[in-house]
Amino acid sequence: MNLGVIGAGSWGTALAQILSVNFENVFIWDIDKEVLDSVKNSNINVKYHPDIKLNTNIKPIYDLQELINISDILIVVIPTQYIRQTLSKVKIENKPVISASKGIEIESLKLVSDIMEESLGIDRKYIFALSGPSFAKEVIKGLPTAVVLAGNTEIGNKLLSYLNTKTFRVYLSDDLVGAEVGGAIKNVIAIAAGISDGLGFGSNARASLITRGLYEISKIVKIYGGNPQTVYGLSGLGDLVLTATGELSRNRTFGMLIGQGYSVEEALKKVGQVVEGYTTVKAVYDIKNKYNIELPISYQVYRVLYENLNPKDAAMELMNRGYKFEFMEENK
């Protein structure tokens, strides 16, 4: 069996390395040819994991269509806003395609699974999402990690033996939508938690943001037709807790920099990698307006990042909203 990984960034490379023990070959493709060259010449992804020697069965492929043709299972690990334009250029027969990307397409408000279905023209039963609390730098070092594979359970059950390793445990779920929404929106809430930390608001505020943020995620899961209970699993609560508290979280780090007074441009530059929550919050803002639902935390993050609202003022607006029950009727 051959695995094809589309996107050789930090997460794509980590998945290629940890799963290489289960495949004869792991082929990787990336738009950045320098990354592929470094893997080809030294078995090291110098840009993202310069301290990790990759297994020798990980092989760079410079033509995306070739990688698709010679792979039995595909994992897509590229920024959400570039998935459609990348996959629309290739053809694929029905084979499992797993999204490890997290986000919502800004223009269409569609999830990654919908983008892949439209771009690739394959049966939806072959489309999956891999999501959960999983920092790439820990996964690639073989530190214990548990995630969830969401999609068609009949096909998914057959994939588990190829995705599980001694240190990488994969559970199965039939809620593709719920897993995708959780993985996408948690980045926005993590930015909020980071802003709070950057302002020095402490542990109480962070815990409150995470908890109320989870409620916002459940609202969006329901709107997209997923199971709200999914938010209490690895792809929801698990991923949110990690991303909102972990020192390796790009979204939390970005938020902290904003809270400390850096401009958006300065913060993005200092992080140095894709901050998915920065673009996802634009989609969440549109979802809020389209469906007329209250998403107060996400809304304040949007205002801070795109309307130059002072982070302290945003926090005060959250704290001084009208009195409410903890859990309101749906979509209120």
UniProtKB/Swiss-Prot annotation:
<dbReference type="InterPro" id="IPR006168">
    <property type="entry name" value="G3P_DH_NAD-dep"/>
</dbReference>
<feature type="binding site">
    <location>
        <position position="250"/>
    </location>
    <ligand>
        <name>sn-glycerol 3-phosphate</name>
    </ligand>
</feature>
<feature type="binding site">
    <location>
        <position position="102"/>
    </location>
    <ligand>
        <name>sn-glycerol 3-phosphate</name>
    </ligand>
</feature>
<dbReference type="GO" id="GO:0046167">
    <property type="term" value="P:glycerol-3-phosphate biosynthetic process"/>
</dbReference>
<dbReference type="GO" id="GO:0005829">
    <property type="term" value="C:cytosol"/>
</dbReference>
<dbReference type="Pfam" id="PF07479">
    <property type="entry name" value="NAD_Gly3P_dh_C"/>
</dbReference>
<dbReference type="Pfam" id="PF01210">
    <property type="entry name" value="NAD_Gly3P_dh_N"/>
</dbReference>
<dbReference type="GO" id="GO:0046168">
    <property type="term" value="P:glycerol-3-phosphate catabolic process"/>
</dbReference>
<feature type="binding site">
    <location>
        <position position="102"/>
    </location>
    <ligand>
        <name>NADPH</name>
    </ligand>
</feature>
<comment type="similarity">
    <text>Belongs to the NAD-dependent glycerol-3-phosphate dehydrogenase family.</text>
</comment>
<dbReference type="GO" id="GO:0006650">
    <property type="term" value="P:glycerophospholipid metabolic process"/>
</dbReference>
<feature type="active site" description="Proton acceptor">
    <location>
        <position position="186"/>
    </location>
</feature>
<dbReference type="GO" id="GO:0005975">
    <property type="term" value="P:carbohydrate metabolic process"/>
</dbReference>
<feature type="binding site">
    <location>
        <position position="136"/>
    </location>
    <ligand>
        <name>NADPH</name>
    </ligand>
</feature>
<protein>
    <recommendedName>
        <fullName>Glycerol-3-phosphate dehydrogenase [NAD(P)+]</fullName>
        <ecNumber>1.1.1.94</ecNumber>
    </recommendedName>
</protein>
<dbReference type="InterPro" id="IPR011128">
    <property type="entry name" value="G3P_DH_NAD-dep_N"/>
</dbReference>
<feature type="binding site">
    <location>
        <position position="276"/>
    </location>
    <ligand>
        <name>NADPH</name>
    </ligand>
</feature>
<dbReference type="InterPro" id="IPR008927">
    <property type="entry name" value="6-PGluconate_DH-like_C_sf"/>
</dbReference>
<feature type="binding site">
    <location>
        <position position="186"/>
    </location>
    <ligand>
        <name>sn-glycerol 3-phosphate</name>
    </ligand>
</feature>
<keyword id="KW-0444">Lipid biosynthesis</keyword>
<dbReference type="InterPro" id="IPR013328">
    <property type="entry name" value="6PGD_dom2"/>
</dbReference>
<feature type="binding site">
    <location>
        <position position="11"/>
    </location>
    <ligand>
        <name>NADPH</name>
    </ligand>
</feature>
<keyword id="KW-0547">Nucleotide-binding</keyword>
<keyword id="KW-0560">Oxidoreductase</keyword>
<keyword id="KW-0443">Lipid metabolism</keyword>
<feature type="binding site">
    <location>
        <position position="274"/>
    </location>
    <ligand>
        <name>NADPH</name>
    </ligand>
</feature>
<keyword id="KW-1208">Phospholipid metabolism</keyword>
<keyword id="KW-0521">NADP</keyword>
<feature type="binding site">
    <location>
        <position position="134"/>
    </location>
    <ligand>
        <name>sn-glycerol 3-phosphate</name>
    </ligand>
</feature>
<dbReference type="InterPro" id="IPR036291">
    <property type="entry name" value="NAD(P)-bd_dom_sf"/>
</dbReference>
<feature type="binding site">
    <location>
        <position position="250"/>
    </location>
    <ligand>
        <name>NADPH</name>
    </ligand>
</feature>
<dbReference type="GO" id="GO:0051287">
    <property type="term" value="F:NAD binding"/>
</dbReference>
<keyword id="KW-0520">NAD</keyword>
<keyword id="KW-0963">Cytoplasm</keyword>
<dbReference type="GO" id="GO:0047952">
    <property type="term" value="F:glycerol-3-phosphate dehydrogenase [NAD(P)+] activity"/>
</dbReference>
<dbReference type="GO" id="GO:0008654">
    <property type="term" value="P:phospholipid biosynthetic process"/>
</dbReference>
<feature type="binding site">
    <location>
        <position position="239"/>
    </location>
    <ligand>
        <name>sn-glycerol 3-phosphate</name>
    </ligand>
</feature>
<comment type="pathway">
    <text>Membrane lipid metabolism; glycerophospholipid metabolism.</text>
</comment>
<feature type="binding site">
    <location>
        <position position="10"/>
    </location>
    <ligand>
        <name>NADPH</name>
    </ligand>
</feature>
<dbReference type="InterPro" id="IPR006109">
    <property type="entry name" value="G3P_DH_NAD-dep_C"/>
</dbReference>
<feature type="binding site">
    <location>
        <position position="249"/>
    </location>
    <ligand>
        <name>sn-glycerol 3-phosphate</name>
    </ligand>
</feature>
<comment type="function">
    <text>Catalyzes the reduction of the glycolytic intermediate dihydroxyacetone phosphate (DHAP) to sn-glycerol 3-phosphate (G3P), the key precursor for phospholipid synthesis.</text>
</comment>
